[in-house]
Amino acid sequence: MRRTAAKVVDGNVVRFSFDAIAPFMVFDRAAWYKNSTWLLPLLYASLTAMLLTVLLWPVSVIVRRRFGAPLVLERREMLAHRFIRIAGLLTIVMAAGWVMLVAAMSASIDNLTSALDPYVWLLEIASLIVFVGGLAVALWHAWIVWRGAHRRWQAKLWSVVLVVAAMTVLWIGLAFKMISFGVNY
């Protein structure tokens, strides 16, 4: 028979545990900034926006080439156009790297030793560069798009979506210590 204990404050359960793990583990509520109820849908939407941006890059090139439509962008607009897609690709690669690392760590308890520490360090350093750099590129891209007089409202809206996506990825990276420079997990 299992016994469960809970701490109740003002009629709400704020933490609980059960007999087998009670001496060393207690389940607390997640803080608002780590709550997966709103973070996971936002993360999925953010990664989807970045994935669409990356996948539609070659599609737009093929369509323009097929119908002979030139890409009429100034030099800075072209750089922003390319850099936001590269930043999106790198962000997706980093997310996949973290998923693979967590899967490897979950596969065997032997992987929770120092065996995977170099990979954790590598991903933490790369996450700092990619997530912060991705937000900087997204902000620059949005600034360039909003400054352009000939840009359509869809491009302006999508630039804001990409800024929110980059901010979300950086927020999750900071909240869940993907950018922490430590292997204390």
Question: Regions from the language model: what does each represent?
Answer:
Residues 1-185:
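Peripheral terminal and inter-domain segments
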